[in-house]
A protein has these predicted regions:
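Conserved non-cysteine loop/helix-boundary elements of the Radical SAM core domain that shape
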Residues: 1-56, 62, 67-81
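Terminal RNA-binding accessory module
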Residues: 72-162
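Short hydrophobic alpha-helical module
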Residues: 20, 60, 92-96
Length: 162
């Protein structure tokens, strides 16, 4: 896909980030079913997700677009195969997202609360975990220290300290 870096270079950079920022949220987008993608290529994508331990991945299936080089490439991938691969990668991503969130439940997190809906305030930790907290006071546009209570698409948290 014309990437200007190797797998090894990518892993090296991820390891440097992890060395200096162990709880950094590393995210990625992954296309499955790009023309010519072999089962071995797909399995390597799965291995990279495991090796890096991404906090979140966005998976999408390649779709043919007119007037692109990829549209006329040989070895187009069957839709059923793309669907199966996408489902496997999404499940793996969710597994690693939960691991990441559980690891971050151990330490206080700073959150900028940006939205409110009927006494629930929503924001992101500094390492991109989406959280919500109930509060009687207005938290909108405030940074607060929180304890994450659970995992999920939007994790529940409680305000700690002031």
């Amino acid at each position: 896909m014309n990437r200007r870096y190797t797998r090894e270079e990518y892993l090296e950079k991820a390891n440097i980030i992890r060395k200096y920022m162990p709880h950094a949220g590393l995210t990625t987008d992954i296309i499955v079913g790009f023309p010519g993608e072999s089962e071995e290529d797909f399995q390597d994508s799965m291995r990279i997700v495991r090796e890096v331990g991404f906090s979140r991945i966005h998976v999408f299936k390649y779709s043919k677009r007119k007037n692109t080089k990829a549209a006329v490439m040989k070895n187009q991938i069957d839709g059923k195969v793309k669907k199966e691969r996408s489902e496997k990668l999404i499940a793996l991503g969710e597994e690693y997202q939960e691991i990441f969130e559980k690891e971050n439940m151990k330490t206080p997190q700073s959150v900028l609360f940006e939205e409110d809906h009927e006494g629930e305030y929503y924001g992101y930790t500094t390492n991109y975990i989406r959280v919500k907290a109930k509060s009687q006071i207005d938290l909108k546009n405030k940074i607060k220290s929180v304890k994450i209570l659970d995992t999920g698409e939007i994790a529940n948290c409680e305000i700690i300290g002031d």
